Amino acid sequence: MATKRSLIYNELSSELYKKFFLTHDEKQAAKDGYIYIHDRSARLDTVNCCLFDVGSVMKNGFEMGNIWYNEPNYLDTAFDVMGDIILSTAAQQYGGFTVPEVDKILEPYAEKSYKKYYEEYMNIADDIDYECKPEIHSEEADKYATDKVHRDFEQGWQGIEMKLNSVGSSRGDYPFVTMTTGLATSKFGKMASITLLNVHSEGQGKKGFKRPVLFPKIVFLYDKELHGDGSDKYPLADVFNAGIDCSAKTMYPDWLSLTGDGYVAEMYKKYKRIVSPMGCRAFLSPWYEKGGMYPESQDDKPVFVGRFNLGRL
C-alpha cells in the first residue's frame, strides 16, 4: 500500500512542481533534454540530503512527535534512541541521510555502560570473596565490563541493521542511511567502528543463508597518519584492518581519503573538519561560522554537520 501511494503521490507532486515552480523556458528545456531536474517528484518544500547532528540532538534530551526523550544513560539505550531518530527524520526528506562520525557519537555512552558494568562486577565480587586482592578484582571487572560493552555494540548494530532494512517510510521506500566512521582513537571509539564493520560482514538472515544488508551504507574515513598501511605502528591499525576485512567480504565500506588530494582532503588538512558524504555522493560546500560563504578570518572554520541541501538540477 505504501508503494502504491508513493507512486501516485510522486506523479502528482511532479506535475505540481512543473506547473507552479518552473518557467516556460525551464519546462521546455527539460522536455527537450537539455536539463534534468533531479527528484522532481519530491521537491515541494522538502529537504533533499543532510548531515544529521545526532549527537547534539541526543545530548540533554529532545522532543520528537508528542514524546520527550531523555538523553540515553547507557549504550544500549543510545542505539535505540538513535534508531528512532533516524527512522523519524529520514522519512521527512527524500535524499541521503548521513550520521557523520557515528563512532564518536556512541563513544561517551559506551564509557557510561563500562562504568556501570565495572561497578556491577565489583559489588558482586566484594560480596562473594572478601579475601581476594583488590587489584585482581579490578582486572576481572575490567574484562567483564569490556566484554559486556562489546556485546552491547554487537547487539546495537544488529538492531540498527534490522530497523533500517525492515521499517519502510511513508514514501514507500527504505531511507538511504549512511554512517561515517573510523577516526575515534579511544578504546570504545575504536570498538564502535570495529563492531560495526564486523556485524556488517556477518550479514543478517537465517543461519547458513546470511547476507550483508543495504543500510546503513558505511563510509570509512581514512587518515594516512592514523591508519597507514595497517601495521602496528599506526594507532588505528586495528580499525583499518577491520575495514579491509569487511571490504574483502562485502561491498562496504566505501573509503574516503582525508589525507589525499581534492576538496574533502583540503578541508580536513586545513581545518580538521570532516566532509562526510550525504547519502552516496553529495558533498556540502563550506559554510563558515562567522563569514558564511567566505571565511571572515584565518581562524574562521567551516561547518558541515547539521546542514542539508534542497536539491539540484
Name these PLM-found stretches.
Residues 2-313:
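Conserved catalytic cores of very large enzyme subunits
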